[in-house]
Each structure stands twice: as C-alpha cells, then as structure tokens.
Amino acid sequence: MEQTWRWYGPNDPVSLDDIRQAGATGIVTALHHIPNGEVWPVEEIKKRQAELAQKGLTWSVVESIPVHEDIKTHTGQYDRYIASYQQSIRNLAACGIDTVCYNFMPILDWTRTDLEYTLPDGSKALRFDHIAFAAFELHILKRDGARHDYTDDEQRQAQDYFSAMSEAQIETLTRNIIAGLPGAEEGYTLDQFRARLSEYDHIDKTALRDNMAYFLKAIVPVAEEAGVRLAVHPDDPPRPILGLPRIVSTIEDMQWLKETVDSIHNGFTMCTGSYGVRADNDLVRMVETFADRIHFTHLRSTCREANPKTFHEAAHLYGDVDMVAVVKAILTEEQRRKKAGDLRPIPFRPDHGHQMLDDLRKKTNPGYSAIGRLKGLAEVRGVELALKKVLFPDLL
C-alpha cells in the first residue's frame, strides 16, 4: 500500500515538509485554482508536479477533478463540461498521473453539522447530528417537503433543538453545512442554496443515475485510452439528504456502477468512513467483491451514536470500522495484483484526523489537521506492517 496524504496546495496550513516528516511519499491533491468545469492545462499540472518533486514527493492521486453541476443535472452546458473533463484526463495522463478520484454528490460534497465536537480526551472531531440537520432543514432552510423526510418524533426533537439555539449557533450550523468544507468547490448563501436545490426538483434517483451513466459512457473510454483509473468516492453521509438523491452509497450502487460501464478503469475509492456510516454496509465484502476496481482508499472510522443516523469521526483503529479486516482485504488484493504482474501498490491516505495537541491552537482545515492524520497514518501503517509480517511476507 502506498502511503499518501491529502494536500490542499500552497495555502494548506500543513506544509510539504510536514508531510514528508509524516512518512507519506505520495500526494493527493488537485488544481483548486482552476475554475470548476475548465480544462486542467498541462503546464499547470507540471508546475504542481515540480513543486512536489522539490520536496521528494510525487503526485499519486488527483482528488478531485470536480464534476460540474450541469453534468449532474444534465442541463446547460453539460457536453462542454464533459469535453473539458475528458481533456483534463488526457492532460493528466500525459504527465504520468494515472488515478483520478471524483464524486457525483449533488450540490454538496461531504456534510457535517459540528466541526469542533469535543471528545472525552479533549481532542476535537467532526460530527453529523441528525437532529441538528433536521433543525437546519425545517427551521433555517425551510425546505419545502422536508417534513416528509422526518418522523413526528424527529420533528419534535428538531423543534426543541432549534428553539434552544442562539443566533450565533444558527449562523455556525448554517455555515458548516452550506459554506463549503475542505475539498468542496462551492459555498452558498441560503438563497443561493435554495435556488440550487430547486434545480433537482425533478431529478430522482433514477434520473441522477441516468445522468451519471451518460457521464461515465463519455469519460471511461477516454480513461481507457489514456491509461487512467477513475475512482468514484461514495456519498457522505451515504443516504439521501435535503431531498437530494444519492447513488453511491451501498454495495448495490457499486454493482450498478460496475455494470453501467464494465471497465477496469471505472473503479472505486473505498472510503471506509463514508460507507461505514451505514450499519448495513459490509466493508470487507465490498472490498472483496470489487477488489480489482478499487484504485484508491480513504481509511478512517466513524462511530454511530444512540440515534444511528448521528455519527462522529472516531479514532482510526476504533469506532464501527474493523480497520484490521479492511486492510487485510486490501493487502489480499494487492498480493493478487502483484502475482498478476501489476506492481503498483494501492494508494491509501489517512482520512479526517482529530484536531489534537498543539493543532488545537492553530488554524486548520476541518478534518485535515496535521497531528491527527499523522497519528492515523502511523496506526494504519502499523496494522499494514503487522499483517505483512504474518500473512503477506512477499509484499514486504
């Protein structure tokens, strides 16, 4: 497994020198300064590669080339944006970059309600509170039809939650949900967000699948020709929110994606923290079923709370994800590939570390502080090494 680290570019508080000291050799990044929907020029790709090479690092995975909303809704200039996406894939391949992570989540990428949830040990984690989110939908956003998505009891709890909120708390919750978390390409005001939601009024799960199928049938052949592996990231959280459909949340969704364009280049990012939020997602079975299509992994854990729709980010080796079993399944696939002549290790990155130690006194990107991810990387590295020593000595 290749040890990688997500870096948000020159403005990231975590420097390339920091990353190198953490033990990562590969960088997961994107050209965040290129507007969504525009082609990534070869010159800009090479410039970023040179910046990394100066520190002895390589650009291992693109995360992400954003999928424009016109593509997801199949409206406006979707064909132009698909053509731009195709050319960006070609340009990345020309520079030797062969793995692209992306997602097809409508409007929002990943969603949390609390970015500073204090754990018993004093460190801070990200949290999704189902009732807080209901309060946002019902009483702040006031989305039409939102009541149909919540039980009577949930609506009562949301009313009580909202009634106890101060103006500052309302502002913070709103900002956390719609202003854009790290990796998101867009943030919104409430009115902008309502307008964007209205674009999905007539798009259900079937229609969104149709739009994604159109996209895949256009870009996978280009990826095949260029030798690029596409790796779709799951929905986070992996269920419908805000009345929006979600189509990359379960093993059934993965099967649909595989069958829609049956190519090894149409693959997956195995994000254990996203898929693992659902108790009905068997992560090891997912890895084993789609092993040859897993081109990238995000290894983190979450912990479901008393309300199973509420969760927080757990320590990497604890929570609801059996990290040892997942890493074993990944190494089993890596061993199979090695025997078949594919010597490329499967890249993984430690996802969403806790904010801890002196990072508590620093400005950090939510979920992407240095020390929490350093801890996660070291822990997963230890699991990997122990498994290799005992079960996979030929991978050492």
UniProtKB/Swiss-Prot annotation:
**GO biological process per UniProt:** D-glucuronate catabolic process
- EC code: 4.2.1.8
Assigned keywords, A-Z: Iron, Lyase, Manganese
Q: Name one Pfam family in it.
A: UxuA
Task: Identify the metabolic or biological route this protein is part of.
Answer: Carbohydrate metabolism; pentose and glucuronate interconversion
Tell me where on the tree of life, at the top rank, the source sits.
Answer: Bacteria
The reactions it catalyses are: D-mannonate = 2-dehydro-3-deoxy-D-gluconate + H2O
| The protein's enzyme class | lyase
> Which cofactors are required for activity?
Fe(2+); Mn(2+)
User: Which Gene3D superfamilies is this protein grouped with?
Assistant: Divalent-metal-dependent TIM barrel enzymes
Q: Mind listing the GO molecular function terms for this protein?
A: ferrous iron binding; manganese ion binding; mannonate dehydratase activity
Which InterPro entries does this UniProt record tie to the protein? Man_deHydtase, Xyl_isomerase-like_sf
NCBIfam families from the UniProt entry: PRK03906.1 (NF003027), uxuA (TIGR00695)
Which family is this protein grouped under?
Answer: Belongs to the mannonate dehydratase family.
What the protein does? Catalyzes the dehydration of D-mannonate.
Q: What is this protein called?
A: Mannonate dehydratase
Name of the coding gene: uxuA
